[in-house]
């Protein structure tokens, strides 16, 4: 495929499957001499440190499902099956960056509930579930910085597609396609980021035109406090509904 100019986007869960894919990419890179193919592996829930190094060396994009990193019920059976040490490799993110790889986030929709940008940023930065009490992730060293969490949803995606000259960042000459949120993902308190996942984005812009615009949310301090108290219950309803609220 690579010889014909096609990229391979592989879905692999276990460390054996990912090892096989990394070996195939290594062979392809050595045969073609092209270290900028940007083949990608998604899910990658268990990856050995040695293979993470190959992700960096051979330009394999790490499409990580770090939204599943907290110890939620769906992941409760992992550690008893693979052992405590291998469980620490679950849903890696920062370790791929340390190995020189590019990390991209994904939601796995429709297999999993449709997760939005605030949810993805919050779980990437904290490795915890927003708004509800749950055990933290077993591997907090995999937490991303806020900047890297945003790159995983924007500029790194464009890079994976070989489209970094057209999209992914706000620059003159690039496509003006963007979503606007009523939250500062870099500077706002993480509780505010978590709360924003239940609200619509402020606007959607396509080709420089506003195609969706929400009414500004106005409330008193008392109304805001009441909303914050309701958020855990609302979030549990949202998480249980595959289509969201």
Model-derived regions, located:
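Active-site core of metal-dependent hydrolases
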Residues: 1-90, 98, 104, 182
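Active-site microenvironment of metallo-dependent hydrolases
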Residues: 12, 102, 109-245
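Glycine/threonine-rich phosphate-binding loop and adjacent beta-strand/alpha-helix elements that clamp
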Residues: 93
